[in-house]
């Protein structure tokens, strides 16, 4: 079986003798037809400390060919599903290979109204967005009966609204009934507003904090920093309302000190939803049952949200060529010379 692995020289290579996995109890075996890139893919594989031979890849779309014990064959065999695997943090269960196995509860069925490439843009970053906004901040998920959540006067600030995570945070916050203000580059303003932002701000503007406060009438009470750099989190916290008593800003991976005591920065790690422990370059990531339960609930509802147009996938930059195309495409992705698009490689 072909797979893409770390080459031990801060790069990746394609091999043809990787072992084909076998589904265990509660799992499926799928033939991978699409993979999408996330920053963790290149940041872990382009790293001298990663073990040579580690298989890469997180987001995938696959056609189910077999299932393990306890899985309804009539429901899954032949179905097209999408999810994300632990990837480089667990090289034995990663997406950049011809076949993949995973817990059937951690994938969603791809609806007919979106393409496999669009489907590949969702799993990891949508999970991250929902984990932060819905699980940790407690904002309601979009209804599944066509109704709408009650409108709120409070604002949610999304820093880096045009990132893959940010685009899904904007949509989830909008459907939660909150007003949304997002930072991004001006050329992405229209797209981010289409996704649900009420106001967009150029994050390059030296007066970005003051602009946010004025646009929201000093009413930002929740925030999500999808960039999660120390400087972006600091600016985001400063933009919170002067009236806030218990503000919360979601940060991906870490919980840096907050410049305001009344605003807490909450670090989230989406790998906690897997039922095992990970070592993230010396930092232990332990499983959290609530994160698994939340992911299962979200994946059950995601197919319907996509069918109804409640959730819009990221825009796609697609690469042909199968697994052999990944090394070159990954280098382009790592260069950072792209905006508001998800890199997807066709494997079939």
Curated annotation (Swiss-Prot):
<protein>
    <recommendedName>
        <fullName>Zinc-type alcohol dehydrogenase-like protein C2E1P3.01</fullName>
        <ecNumber>1.-.-.-</ecNumber>
    </recommendedName>
</protein>
<dbReference type="GO" id="GO:0005739">
    <property type="term" value="C:mitochondrion"/>
</dbReference>
<dbReference type="Pfam" id="PF00107">
    <property type="entry name" value="ADH_zinc_N"/>
</dbReference>
<dbReference type="GO" id="GO:0008270">
    <property type="term" value="F:zinc ion binding"/>
</dbReference>
<dbReference type="InterPro" id="IPR013149">
    <property type="entry name" value="ADH-like_C"/>
</dbReference>
<dbReference type="InterPro" id="IPR011032">
    <property type="entry name" value="GroES-like_sf"/>
</dbReference>
<keyword id="KW-0496">Mitochondrion</keyword>
<dbReference type="InterPro" id="IPR020843">
    <property type="entry name" value="PKS_ER"/>
</dbReference>
<comment type="similarity">
    <text>Belongs to the zinc-containing alcohol dehydrogenase family. Quinone oxidoreductase subfamily.</text>
</comment>
<keyword id="KW-0560">Oxidoreductase</keyword>
<dbReference type="InterPro" id="IPR047122">
    <property type="entry name" value="Trans-enoyl_RdTase-like"/>
</dbReference>
<dbReference type="InterPro" id="IPR036291">
    <property type="entry name" value="NAD(P)-bd_dom_sf"/>
</dbReference>
<dbReference type="GO" id="GO:0016651">
    <property type="term" value="F:oxidoreductase activity, acting on NAD(P)H"/>
</dbReference>
